[in-house]
C-alpha cells in the first residue's frame, strides 16, 4: 500500500469534482475537498477522498464504491434481506466486499459463527481498514471473520 498522497486535481483545502460517467448520456459528479490516500495495486487504482456530502469515500478505478454516510443504502439491504429470508444464518460468504461493510452487517447477527470475505485485492481491505472505520466498524478484527485473498471463483470451486 502506498503512502497517503496529496490531491492531484486540487490543492489541499480547495475543491475539485470527481466525475463518474456511467453511459454516454448519464453520470454523476461529487465535490471532493481532499485526496486522503491513494494506492495503485497490481490490479487497480484505489483512492480515499473526502467529500463534504458523504464524508470519506472509496473510489476504485475512478468509480465510487462506498462512503461513510451512505454505505447503509448498499450493505443493509444486500445482507439483511437474504438473512431474514433464511431465518437463521450461521455462516456467510461475501464475494468482494473489501470495504468490510457487508461483513459488519452479517456479524451483527448473534448466531453468526463464521463470515468468509473473499476479496481479490488485499489493498482494498488495507485502505478500508485504515481510512473507512465508519464503514467496516471493526469487522476486520472480529475473530468470526476469515479473509481469503485472490481469485474468488477458484476459491468457490475449492469449497466443499
Where are these regions (language model features)?
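N-terminal auxiliary segments of SAM/dcSAM-dependent transferases
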Residues: 2-57
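The AdoMet/dcAdoMet-binding core of the Class I SAM-like
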Residues: 7-18, 41, 66-160
Amino acid at each position: 500500500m502506498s503512502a497517503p498522497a496529496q490531491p492531484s486535481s486540487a490543492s489541499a483545502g480547495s475543491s475539485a469534482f470527481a466525475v463518474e460517467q456511467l453511459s454516454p448520456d448519464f453520470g454523476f459528479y461529487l465535490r471532493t475537498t481532499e485526496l486522503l490516500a491513494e494506492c495503485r495495486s497490481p490490479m487497480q487504482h484505489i483512492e480515499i477522498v473526502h467529500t463534504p456530502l458523504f464524508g470519506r469515500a472509496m473510489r476504485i478505478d475512478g468509480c465510487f464504491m462506498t462512503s461513510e454516510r451512505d454505505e447503509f443504502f448498499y450493505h443493509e439491504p444486500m445482507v439483511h434481506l437474504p438473512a431474514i429470508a433464511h431465518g437463521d444464518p450461521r455462516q456467510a460468504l461475501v464475494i468482494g466486499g473489501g470495504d468490510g461493510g457487508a461483513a459488519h452487517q452479517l456479524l451483527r447477527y448473534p448466531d453468526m459463527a463464521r463470515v468468509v470475505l473473499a476479496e481479490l485485492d488485499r489493498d482494498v481491505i488495507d485502505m478500508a481498514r485504515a481510512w473507512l472505520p465508519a464503514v467496516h466498524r471493526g469487522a476486520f478484527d472480529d475473530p468470526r471473520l476469515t479473509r481469503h485473498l485472490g481469485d474468488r471463483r477458484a476459491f468457490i470451486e475449492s469449497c466443499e
